[in-house]
Amino acid sequence: MSNYTTCTEDAAAVRAALKAKGLGRKHVSVRSDQYSMGSSLRIRVLDPAVRIADVRAIAETKERISRDQFGEILSGSNRFVFVEYDYTVEKVLAASWLSRVETAIAQVSGNSIVPVEGTPYGVAVNAYGAHSLWDISSEVGGHIQGGEAHTLAYSIGARLGLAPEAV
């Protein structure tokens, strides 16, 4: 007996697992695509209160990617899983953190990283005036992303969910 499941069956299993966690069609959209050399599951989070990490943990159990000894992806029968926020949710997440990011940006001077209140992240401005988001939670930390304030705010929201006062 084979353990192979179709992409449609995997999509149904993901929907059932999400539903068991209380996440239905109003919270998460699950779509399956099949094509000549593989298939994919596309999961879009439709509710800003849903943590994408929780959805990703369920969905990525269905991912199957065959690789050679060098790590290159082999053609055929791969199942890719994509989990992302819906665009409307991205805007809500960014808006919930924007004031904190703007406050931190206003405090940056010289070669410093200013913490964003309530997060393990900080913002900096380089010599050319561009903003960037940094992980300041550990010694290892590092650069996460550059961009305008709303882009950095969305990046925080994608990692942490809604800001506490927005919940």
Regions found by a protein language model. Give the residues of each.
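Charged, low-complexity surface segments at secondary-structure and domain boundaries
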Residues: 1-2, 43-45, 84-88
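Short, surface-exposed ligand-recognition loops at beta-strand->loop->(often short) alpha-helix junctions
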Residues: 3-10
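Amphipathic, interaction-prone secondary-structure segments
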Residues: 11, 15-52
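Intrinsically disordered, low-complexity regulatory regions enriched in serine/threonine/proline
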Residues: 51-167
